[in-house]
Amino acid sequence: MLALHAETREPDMSHKQYDTLSNDTILQLAHRALVNYPACAQAEVRLLCRSENATLSVSTPQGRYALRIHRGDYHAKQDIESELLWLDALQAADISVPAAVEDRQGERIQVLPLPDGGERYAVLFHWIEGDMLTDSVDPAAFRQLGAITARLHHHSRKWQKPQGFRRIIWDHHTMVSPAGHWGDWRDVAGLPTAEHAVVEETLEHVRRQMLDFGQSPERYGLIHADLRLTNLLVHKGETRVIDFDDCGMGWYLHDLAAAISFVEHHPSAPQWVENWLRGYEQVAHISDRELAMIPAMLIQRRIQLTAWVASHRETEMARSLGDRWASHTVRLCQRYLEGAALPIGI
């Protein structure tokens, strides 16, 4: 049982932003973790993807599971347990999210020692069936995304966090400063030093806006923080949300900005945002004051992701973005400074 009062965690930027373990080592860790689950004794294990964490498919005669192996030095065990507590509460509120599996000792988090003295945490989840929506489908998919996000926000505002609840902080400093969780955007490939001034001017404008907007409980609280279409599944008409690894304390409107992560420069991005807002408004109201903050939220997220791309350059996701992604960031910053209603798209 966690014994501390609810709290938030500051970043530690002294560690690498990506996991240096090989795929073979990840698979070895997976098999070690699964020893603690009797149902997985004869499991077939397959690596699905690697980003902040490694996600593996675990197939058994009794059913399928997803095993998440955390990279080192990102979340402490207390933070992961807090994520699982929110998932428990969301399930109790009839929102379909991943459910962690207890091992033979009743534990939900495995601690896996490494030869160098380090360790990795692992969590086994029941597999969630569903079709993953993409930005190539009907833009109305973003209405579903907006609607389920509104339900999460409603729950977050009402939920009484248990003692010891602790999650990562997503504010302006931890997102886009040189000491942010994901590093310094200035380190991204393809961004000439001469163009830093445009981004810096943008961030100063955004910083002042965020300071004025404030962090009242109606505007700032526990959010998913990475709720895009790739983390939304639809099964038999039910909308299901996955991948809460980045959940933490942030502005609720940050979840809108996260909805178009990495594709803010896409020609359809404005249409996606409009559809997201329509879906959200079907469940909850967004005030005019909040609507006025959307441009700042969008460009802040894009710069945050620019830092992520810089610090995760070895990942498949970062490599897939191409050589012009950083230059698009500068172009969107210029649109923001010019007062564009939505600093996204072409």
What are these regions (language model features)?
Residues 1-105, 236, 344-346:
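Conserved NTP-binding catalytic cores of kinases and kinase-like/nucleotidyltransferase enzymes
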Residues 14-17, 305-346:
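ATP/Mg2+ or Mg2+-diphosphate-binding catalytic cores
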Residues 52-62, 66-67, 100, 207-253:
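Active-site acidic catalytic loop and adjacent metal/ATP-binding pocket
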Residues 60-161:
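ATP-binding pocket architecture of kinase catalytic cores
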Residues 72, 130, 239, 247-249, ...:
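Activation segment
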Residues 106, 120-135, 180-190, 303-320:
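A glycine-centered beta->alpha junction motif in the catalytic cores
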Residues 252-285, 301-317:
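Active-site activation/catalytic loop segments of kinase-like enzymes and analogous catalytic loops
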